[in-house]
Amino acid sequence: MKITPIAFESLGVRSQATLIETKDLRVLVDPAVSLAPRRYNLPPHQREVDRLTQLAKVLVDVAKDVDVIVVSHYHYDHHDPGYVIPTDIYKNKIVFLKDPQNMINNSQKYRRAPRFLRSIKDKPRKIEIADGKTFEFNTTTISFSPAVPHGADERLGYVIQVAISDKDSTVIFTSDIEGAPKDVHLKFTKEKMPTVIIIDGPLSYLLGRALKEEELENSIRNMEEIIKNGLETVIIDHHVLRDINYAQVLKPVHDIAKDLGVRVTTAAEYLNLEPLILEARRKELYKEDNRPAKIPRGLANLLNAGDG
């Protein structure tokens, strides 16, 4: 099995787009890229826009050769109805979707999911509602969790986690569980016993606003619990990498992982690259170059459509 992070916060954008390849098939999970519409009361910097444009092209190129596309939920850093990523990437693919009708919040149920489904209409070879189901492809198994809360607050909606297994290993993509603040977030991982897990981490940059101290502590404790589950590698990237102090936030997790011989890494480091932290450094970027960014129309429409 080969795991290739395509776009993540440590690679410069909001995303969890990941390519997973087994000898039977190639799976692309959550093919979308986005930026924070506002951060530190500043719009995206030109460096962020340029990086998004670059990674969008990579994502489209990767999508040409995949067999399966997974959409874990309907936030714009996980799916795209055509703003930046053309919906032609779904042509002739098997598409596994989060249920657009059940265990879903209103903004996704009545606006985002229907719009997305209209945008890909008649393009995929097959569309499957994936929640809680398992699919076999020769020696590869793709399993999905039932819908679980998008972090501690169900108002943000629900996501599905995905496990991909071949004869040798299992990878779990947690989607947006915000570092697993609830015990229900751990159930799928304990059932599947993965060798590799890709997890988003807590919303620590919103501590005191959208995240309570108790929820952050629960997330760290549960990520420590995950590491004790027989893992070889943990890729922690996405929400927590929006925090300029992410390394300090994750220090307890790194300490336990080190004792257990588990590799904990960002997506960039997994690719043997230096993390490219842009959103969390937006103030610094504007100090270096305060010219307004030239934002393409599609990206402008995406940013105007709302955060997340």
From Swiss-Prot:
Signal peptide (residue range): none
One Pfam family, short name: Lactamase_B_2
Disulphides: none
Membrane-spanning parts: none
Protein origin, superkingdom: Archaea
GO MF: hydrolase activity
UniProt similarity note: Belongs to the UPF0282 family.
Protein name stated in the entry: UPF0282 protein SSO3251
Organism encoding this protein: Saccharolobus solfataricus (strain ATCC 35092 / DSM 1617 / JCM 11322 / P2) (Sulfolobus solfataricus)
Lineage: Archaea, Thermoproteota, Thermoprotei, Sulfolobales, Sulfolobaceae
